[in-house]
Every structure is written in structure tokens, then in C-alpha cells.
């Protein structure tokens, strides 16, 4: 008996000694739950998420339109002559809407047809990987990005409990990217287990909306020649849309050339005129039967557009009644989360939660709205993803008058290139800006900043101004980030005009030479 007691005592002592060791391990182990933006695969049958049943991603909506281009041209001419654009609108709608027939939700904004992301985050296995180093683990939260973000936030709450239990940790970090930031915001507003959250990262979060989505959903589309020029030059040349270099150079320089001689503006005036004639017919119903059926996309309509968007898409009392369930979900996010998000984050910050905000800049905005010249990451406005930064327009700097009015303390948050004033951000001390890093680009160097934030108590933009100052510049060539340097040498209007003319004629001559020699490749890859 004594021997048995002695063995039991030894076991108990070993267990007692092991408990503190387990606590230390759990404390050192950083687990991050990563909520991506839209884009997870959607399947027609969630019980059989196979390639044959995948309904998202779908083909580009431009592809059906290209097949009816000739007929569209005839319908447009007929509309211009008669003033009746019905056939033109019907042809566009009938080309686009069928592509989303399987993907769209019902009139309550719900998936009642058995479609979904094909993953139950409360029971199925989840994807996890080391995050920068072996002390950090990143776990992916997969969800049906079409649904209400509040619905997905409820699932996230339960998933966090599951992760803590299975990973043997008491807390996790949250990382919300783009639409994932909306889900995080909904969770922070309504979650019952916020004691399980350590740090929160809002990575180019669309919590407060995306400008071009607001313009499309509200019908308040405004075309501007300078914005089209900026957008075409960046996206055609930098994103490799046109694969033949000579063709690409010619097209981009042609856009700039016709803008400089004021012809582009006249052309856009015509497009704007047609758009104003047809938008209530074709745009409203096309949006309603595609992305407008997703409560999640309504969560990305900025507050300034929201009321107009509801009235534009559901433009009769009958439609409002018919889509009452969807509108209720949209209203709930707008009224209870979007317009209170900053106050809620500030409240949680005061309670001890740490927030890291990462925004990006130096890209043209989509040329569709009154803010087409605003600073952006190519998708979302920098002022929105930073929760309040004051930004110079694209390819411009803040005025000397504005800078002179800043206090000495506020000037600490001024970007070296004079494009961003971060002093007006919700969290100016923990908001970083990455220059020249496109919205959909998430380099390893950025991940290292995030992990450094997790590991450093009370880290701010002033903690390490050599490696991680508030404003960093991303290099496509090296994949690294370095401190942003002084003001860019931006050309004057006279210099820009001269450069545009020289560039156009040089590329035009090169284009003609290659055309005559049969050296041009295909237009698109």
C-alpha cells in the first residue's frame, strides 16, 4: 500500500509541476484567427463541395457582354434615335444576370437552395499554418461571404471558443481583412466572449464601406476624365491587362493623350448621358439580382450612399415590401455597426484591447464617383481603411497651408511624402500605412509587422522608427518594406502635358512599326 501511495504522490507532484509549464506555453503561444474578405469558394451543395458543384468564382461579367457587342451597339443607336433604351437595357441585363443565377441569394438575403461555402467551422477541420514563425499560428475562418456579416459574426464567436479549447489558449488575436473587417466589427459589437480576444488587426478593413460599391448601388456614378486617365494608366500597365508591351504602351498613352487635348472629357460626357438615361432600368435591377442580393455587399455601402442606395435598388414600395427581409439585414449592419464602429473600437481600446490598423495608399480610385481622385489602395479609400486619415488627392500632396495649420504634435503623424495626415485617425499611434502595395497584395514583410505588434507590449508607430515607422514603402522587386522618403517630385501641369505628348507619339510610332512588321502579339492574354 505504501508503495502504491508513493507512486500516486509522485504522479500528483509531476502533474502539479506540469500545470505551470503548460500555462507558460499557452501564454507564449500566439494564435490568430484570420477572417479574409470575400472570395471563398461557394458550392451549390454544401454537403458535396466538389469542383463540379463550385459556383464561385464565376467568369468575368465582361465575357457575356463581349459576345453581344454588335447587338448592343445597334440597340444603343436605336435608343439614341428614339429615346427608348428598353432593348439596350434588357440585352445587358439578360447577359449578366444569368451568370449569377446560382450564386444570388433569395429576397431575404439567405441561401435557401443548399448553397454555401462547404465548410462548417464548428465541426469540420480548419486550415492552420505557422504565422511568420513557429510561436505564432494563423487559423483561417471560412464563411459564406454572401450572407449577413452579423450572421457570420455569430459563427465566429463560437469558432473562437472552439479554437481556444483545441489550441489550449485562453485568448486569440483577430485579423480582419477587407470584408473580414466588417465581420470583426459585428463581432466586437455583439460578441459575448470578448474576454477571449487579445489584439485586433483591421487590415484594409471595409467596415465603413467601399466608395465605388456605394456609387454603383446608389446610381450616383460620376465619370471624370482625369480619374479615367489615372485608372487606365495604372491598371492597364501595372496589372498586365494588355499582354503585348507595344499595344499596352500605345493604349495607355492614347488615353492620356486624348485626355490632355480634352477629347476624353467629351467622350465621357456622352457615356455619362447614356448612363443617366439607362441606370434606373438596367443598373438597379442588375445589381438587385447579383451582388445586391448579398447582405454582405450592403455592409460595404458607405453611410453617405446608404439611404440613396436603398431607394435606388428598391425603387418602389412593392419592391421594398418584397425584399423586406434583405433590407432588414442591411439596415441592421448600417444602423447598429457601421455608424457606431469607431465609438465601439474606442470603447474597447479604453478597456484594454489593442488595435492595429493597416491602410494602404498611392493608387487611383475607381473612376466612378465624386471621390474618383481620392487616395486609395486601388479598391478602398485610404481615409476609410485608416478610420479617419486626411489624404491628399491621388498624385498630389497636402497643401502648405494645411500643413502649416497642424500643431507640432500633429506633424509627428504627417507622412514624409506629405500625402497623409494620420493625426486624425481613430488610433493614430497604432495605424500604419503601406505605400505602393495594392489592395489584394499581402506580402510577408507586412505579416512580420503584424507579428511584431503581437509580440511587443504597447507597440506604437514610434517604437521602431527604423524598421517599422508609421509610413512604409513596399517594393514589388524585393517584397520588402522600407521607410517612405521625402515628397515625391510630382510634375507640373505643363511638364505633364509635354511628357504625355512625347510619350504618345513615341509609342504611336513604335506601335505602327510593329504592326507593319507583324510583330504585335495578342491584345489580351
Predicted segment positions?
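Alpha/beta-hydrolase-fold enzymes
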Residues: 225-317, 321
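Positively charged n-region of N-terminal signal peptides that target proteins for export
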Residues: 1-4
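Hydrophobic core
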Residues: 9, 13-17
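Alpha/beta-hydrolase fold catalytic core
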Residues: 139, 143, 147, 277-372
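Membrane-interacting alpha-helical segments
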Residues: 498, 502-509, 513-520
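N-terminal non-catalytic accessory region
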Residues: 27-175, 181-235, 364, 369-506
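A structural signal for short coil/turn segments at secondary-structure junctions
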Residues: 8, 167, 195, 350-351
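Sec-dependent signal peptide cleavage junction
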Residues: 17-28, 525
